């Protein structure tokens, strides 16, 4: 499954220096304010140009409903959730489990998949489905919050691809997941 799928799965996410992607209540102001101070789009537009599908969980999808305009209007959006009603939003498809989602992506002819949200990223990592991760680290320690990483089923070796330093002390590193040969 991991080496024969017709699409690549990439992560592009902001984290605190201590590895959190949001405060415990989901607040992202600590991230967005520093991202704005860093200037630039932090490489997001270059990243997203090769993406045709965005996969996220309910915890990422629901806060995104406040954005106007909808940020993924030109992408297929798939939400992995056991609780979101399947007909909740005509802009997205809802999938109950990872297997069903992967079959859907293959049937749709997905090529570049942006995997977003902590729980979904961890599920994809555990399944060996992430190919590349771009982590944008902002210089703040939150102490507590929603972690990006947690149990991922063992070591996941990474190869460093690049690192960029932006304004306001924001550091972005990209890693490719190494597969056993």
Predicted features along the sequence, with ranges:
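Enzymes that bind and transform nitrogen-containing heteroaromatic metabolites
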Residues: 1-181
């Amino acid at each position: 499954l991991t080496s024969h799928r017709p699409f690549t799965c990439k992560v592009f996410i902001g984290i605190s220096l201590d590895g959190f992607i949001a405060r415990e209540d989901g607040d992202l102001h600590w991230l967005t304010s520093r991202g704005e101070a860093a200037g630039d789009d932090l490489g997001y537009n270059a990243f997203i140009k090769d993406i045709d599908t965005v996969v996220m969980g309910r915890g990422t999808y629901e806060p995104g409903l406040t954005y106007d305009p909808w940020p993924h209007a030109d992408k297929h959006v798939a939400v992995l959730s056991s609780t979101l009603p399947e007909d909740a939003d005509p802009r997205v498809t809802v999938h109950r489990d990872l297997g069903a989602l992967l079959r859907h992506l293959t049937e749709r002819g997905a090529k570049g998949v942006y995997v977003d949200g902590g729980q979904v990223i961890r599920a994809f990592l555990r399944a060996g489905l992430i190919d590349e991760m771009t982590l944008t680290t902002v210089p703040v320690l939150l102490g507590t919050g929603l972690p990006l990483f947690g149990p991922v089923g063992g070591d996941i070796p990474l190869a460093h691809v690049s690192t960029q330093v932006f304004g306001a002390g924001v550091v972005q590193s990209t890693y490719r997941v190494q597969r056993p040969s």
